[in-house]
A protein has these predicted regions:
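Canonical leucine-rich repeat
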Residues: 85-88, 107-109, 128, 149, ...
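Right-handed parallel beta-helix/beta-solenoid
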Residues: 109-113, 130-135, 151-156, 172-177, ...
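Eukaryotic tandem repeat interaction scaffolds
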Residues: 182-184, 196-210, 217
Length: 302
């Protein structure tokens, strides 16, 4: 009986050792990480997919894991011949995105709610929805084909550049933190800047403005508004609304550009208006095509 008991105990120990060995072997070969496969289904654009596979560490296994998603806060995919950023929605921790200089026609960033910086300039965008990106402080969407831009939900915006689009209007009344605004080369007929008290730099050249009121922009230090349609009393009002500059250096007031022909410059700034601007510390300037620089503008006779 004793021998039988000893044999049974030995068998139990052997089996136990086998179970332990099996468990140890399993722990040495964990299951593959769960995540998003970097494939054509999830990232249909071959250039975007190639960039992810070749330029980021997760390209080694072709899987975008949850840990990698949480650590990816910046993506720089500029000038990569990308036509679609489908798949960008998986990067939910993304804070900074540069996708400029590509061939992108549409951009869905509704899932990228942590974005603070977006450069999507020099693409072929006709629409841009940033209503879910309330944390954006910098939005650069220059050189596109946008006919409208709603930034009413982007109250944290400090820098907005929508240069060279097809905009006919732009509402920035909710963007009270704006410091720099560039809306050159659009078709905007009026702009309300009364709530933008922190604005320091304004580019609104080559639009269709007939009036411009800067009386609520006491921190303004730079104004570019050439090739609009501001003249006469409206030019008087514009100059009268410029904030007083009490520093030793003139602030730039780029008001005239005849480089595209005199007929394309709708602004008129007379000699007396030039003197009125200079009395407030602003130097009216015109573009010199020969010197390729901005020079002091003497003013027109009438």
């Amino acid at each position: 009986m004793k021998k039988i008991m000893q044999w049974m105990m030995a068998a139990i120990l052997i089996c136990g050792a086998g179970v332990f060995t099996a468990c140890t072997a399993y722990s040495d070969n964990p299951a593959p990480p769960v995540g998003i496969a970097i494939n054509e289904a999830n990232f249909p654009d071959s250039a975007f997919r190639h960039y992810l596979l070749e330029c980021y560490e997760y390209g080694k296994d072709g899987i975008l894991t949850n840990e990698e998603i949480s650590k990816t806060t910046t993506l720089e995919v500029d000038c990569e011949d990308i036509k679609s950023l489908k798949g960008i929605e998986f990067f939910t921790a993304l804070k900074e995105l540069d996708c400029s200089c590509n061939y992108i026609t549409e951009l869905d960033l509704s899932k990228n709610t942590k974005l603070t910086f977006l450069d999507c300039g020099t693409n072929y965008l006709t629409k841009l929805n940033v209503s879910n990106n309330a944390l954006l402080d910098t939005l650069w969407c220059y050189y596109n084909e946008l006919t409208e831009l709603d930034v009413s939900n982007n109250t944290a915006l400090i820098y907005l550049d929508c240069y060279d689009n097809e905009l006919t209007q732009l509402d920035v009344t909710k963007n009270t933190a704006l410091v720099q605004l560039n809306l050159d080369f659009n078709r905007i007929t009026s702009i309300d800047l009364s709530n933008n008290v922190w604005l320091e730099k304004l580019n609104c050249a080559e639009n269709e403005l007939t009036t411009l009121d800067l009386s609520k922009n006491p921190k303004l230090k730079f104004l570019q508004c050439y090739q609009n349609k501001i003249s006469g009393q409206n030019m008087d009002n514009l100059i009268g609304s410029l904030p007083l500059n009490d520093t030793p250096t003139y602030f730039d007031f780029r008001v005239i550009d005849f480089s595209d022909g005199v007929e394309n410059e709708g602004n008129v700034c007379t000699k007396s208006q030039v003197e009125a601007a200079k009395a407030k510390g602003w130097k009216p300037q015109q573009w010199d095509d020969d010197e390729e620089e901005w020079v002091e503008y003497p003013g027109s006779d009438n």
